[in-house]
Amino acid sequence: MYSEIQRERADIGGLMARPEYREWNPELIKPKKLLNPVKASRSHQELHRELLMNHRRGLGVDSKPELQRVLEHRRRNQLIKKKKEELEAKRLQCPFEQELLRRQQRLNQLEKPPEKEEDHAPEFIKVRENLRRIATLTSEERVL
């Protein structure tokens, strides 16, 4: 019994109306094919084409946005310009100026280590030195 109903439905042809029925009754609304959004928009077509080409070539879509790539490119260019300017400045200096700069750098390096050692000293030693200074100042004031 159930199989007979299925056979009858198969004979009907499903939900779609056959073309001869559409032509026979002019009051029926003829179905229209839906527009593909990729084909409808020019920008979608170009984007889709570009993605397909990149996929075929094996190129992945960049994970970085365009703005970030531009900023990195500018930073890279700025660093290159800066290095070129430094090299040009070194080339333009005469040997006498270069020797003066070397000596100045050596003197700066010799002065820096004592400052660093003071910074690494424990806190109680710094406080003790401050207390000694205060004590010597007060004793000098008493003498005067």
Curated annotation (Swiss-Prot):
Protein localization: Nucleus; Cytoplasm, Cytoskeleton, Stress fiber; Cell junction, Focal adhesion; Cell projection, Ruffle membrane
A GO CC term attached to the entry: cytoplasm
Keyword Nucleus included in the entry's annotation: yes
GO molecular function: actin binding
Domain of life: Eukaryota
Residue ranges the record marks as coiled coil: 67-94
Main localisation: nucleus
InterPro entries per the UniProt record, alphabetical: FAM107
PANTHER family assigned: ACTIN-ASSOCIATED PROTEIN FAM107A (PTHR16768:SF3), DOWN REGULATED IN RENAL CARCINOMA 1/TU3A (PTHR16768)
Reported function: Stress-inducible actin-binding protein that plays a role in synaptic and cognitive functions by modulating actin filamentous (F-actin) dynamics. Mediates polymerization of globular actin to F-actin. Also binds to, stabilizes and bundles F-actin. Involved in synaptic function by regulating neurite outgrowth in an actin-dependent manner and for the acquisition of hippocampus-dependent cognitive function, such as learning and long-term memory.
Complex and partners: Interacts with ACTB. Interacts with COMMD1; this interaction stabilizes COMMD1 in the nucleus. Interacts with MAP1A. Interacts with PRDX1. Interacts with F-actin.
Name of the protein in its database record: Actin-associated protein FAM107A
Organism per entry: Pongo abelii
